[in-house]
Amino acid sequence: MDAPYRIRSAVPADAAPLVAIERRCFSDPWSETSFREALDSPWSFGLVANTGQGIAGYLIAREVAGTGEVLNLAVSPDFRRRGVARALLRAGLVYLRKRRVEEVFLEVRESNRSAQALYLSSGFRPVGQRAAYYRNPKEDALVLWLALEQHA
């Protein structure tokens, strides 16, 4: 890998660089306020992959009553295909397992084949669909699920 990275907890002060990545990755990006609220919430957490050049990617997830949900995962186009997304996802699942979470859900755009490949290869399985879940452009979401006790 060209630029080594380390995974660390995200803090509200990371919101601006996360928005910059978000805008490069998604057509309907989260706002800085959305990131700050997620990172300030007692039910959610964030992880970032930090390089010598700044933040390469992030994961935002939450846990409620034994169920986890990956809310957002993105890697800057400059750092893709280097294992950053997989490392963030793996670290997020470890964190959720330590919190005694038993299952994890996420939504992914039907057209986002690379993200689907990551999630499926990490043990997630399709369990449903949400019609017109995404805006700009309007698109259905696949709902994926992972049983953490089976994913060690």
Predicted regions and their residues:
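Conserved short alpha-helix immediately C-terminal to the canonical SAM/SAH-binding motif I
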Residues: L88, N112-A115
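Acetyl-CoA-dependent GNAT
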Residues: Y5, S9-R80, R86-R99, G128, ...
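DNA-binding alpha-helical recognition surfaces that contact promoter or target DNA
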Residues: A20, A117, S121
